[in-house]
Amino acid sequence: LLTKRLNESMKCGTKIIGQKKLIINYNFNQMSNRRNFIKQVAAASVASSIPSFLMAQQQSNPDRIWANLLHLSYNMWEDTVPLKYKDENYNCASCQEAREWAHPYRPFLTFDDPTWDVLLKEMAAVGMNMVIIDLGDAVQYESHPEIAVKNAWTKKKLRSELAKMRKLGLEPIPKLNFATTHDIWLGEYSRMVSTKKYYDVCRNLISEVIDLFNSPRFFHLGMDEETPSYQQRFDYAIVRQNDLWWGDLYFYIGEVEKKGVRSWIWSDYAWHHRELFFKKMPKSVLQSNWYYGTNFDLKKLDEPTKSYVKLYNDLEEYGYDQVPTGSNHSNEQNMEATVDYCKKVIDPSRLYGFMTAPWRPTMAECLDRHKEAIAQVGRAIKKF
C-alpha cells in the first residue's frame, strides 16, 4: 500500500498523510535512488502525526496572563449566617476561621487595605501581570448605590487603586459573578433573577463597571456552580437551566461585547452538559476550567473527577481560548501541576495564560495563604 501511494505521489509531487496534505519538494534528477525518497516520506509522515505545538519550543509569551483572583467583596455565597459567626466583631484566630466568618452575607466590607497592598506588590515582584477583582457589592455604583455595603469603595477610590495596579504592571480585570449560587451581592435583585428589573440592573452595572475600568480587555461573568448541590445551605435557592440559563448568559455576553470588551467565564457547566456546551458556547468567550486536585493522569482518574481534568483537553479540541485555573485552596501542588499539564495539551495560540484562585478573603488572617498562592505562580513562571 505504501509503495502504491508513493507511486501516485511521485506522479503529482504530493502525499496525503491522514487528513493533512504534505507537499514534498523534490528533484527527480537529484534523487540518489528510490530508497532515499521512501525514507524521506517516512520521516515526514512521522513528523506530520505530531501536533505542531508539541514540536515547537514552549517559550514564555510576554503577553501571557499570570493572574490572581482577589476579592474586594466576599458576599458570593450563603445568604444566612451560622450561629457561631453571628457576632460581627468575631475575633478570627486563623485564616480558616476568617474564611468561614466572611463566607455568609455581611452588610459591610470584609476587606483589609494593608493586606491588599502587600499582595499587589508581591504579585508584581514574582512577575504576575493581572488582577481579577471580584467587585460584588464593594463599590458605590452610581447606577445602583443601594447595592453597596457599608465601607464600600467610592468610584474615586476604585479608580485610584486601578491606577496603582497599572503602575505596578498589573492589569485590572473586573468580575461580577451572575451565577445564582454566587449573586447574593446583588441584594434584593438576587431574588428577581430573569425579570425585567433584573436585566435592567445587570445591564447598568456591566456598563458602569466597564467605564470605571476604562474598557478593560476582559470582563469575568462568573457563571459557575449553578446547581442545587451548591445551594444546600441557602435559605433562598434558585437554579436556571436549559434555554433560560443560555438566554441569560447570552444577555450578559451581549452587554459586555457591545462595549467592545471580551467576556470570560468559568467553564464547569461543561462538566455536566458537555454536548450542549460545545454546541452553544460562543468561541468569543474566554474559558477558565478549574480543577484543584493533584492527579492529572486521566488513566488513573475516575468520574466525575476525570471529566474535570479532561475538559482542558476538550476545550482545546474544540478550539476555545483558555486561562486554566489552579489554586492552593486544597493543597500546595495543584497550581504548578496545572501549568505543567495544560502547557502540554493546549496550543500556545489558545493558551492565554493561567490564573490562581486562593478563595480566601482579603483579610490579614489570610495574608500568608495568599502569599503562598503568589509564590506558587512565581515558581510556575520561572519553569514555564
Model-derived features: where do they sit?
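Substrate-binding cleft/loops of secretory-pathway carbohydrate-active enzymes
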Residues: I265, Y269-L301, E332-K343
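N-terminal secretory signal peptides
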Residues: L1-N36
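C-terminal segment of N-terminal export signals and the immediately downstream linker at the start
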Residues: L22-M31, S52-P62
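Active-site beta-loop-alpha junctions enriched in small/polar residues
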Residues: H71-S73, G136-A138, N177-T181, D224-E226, ...
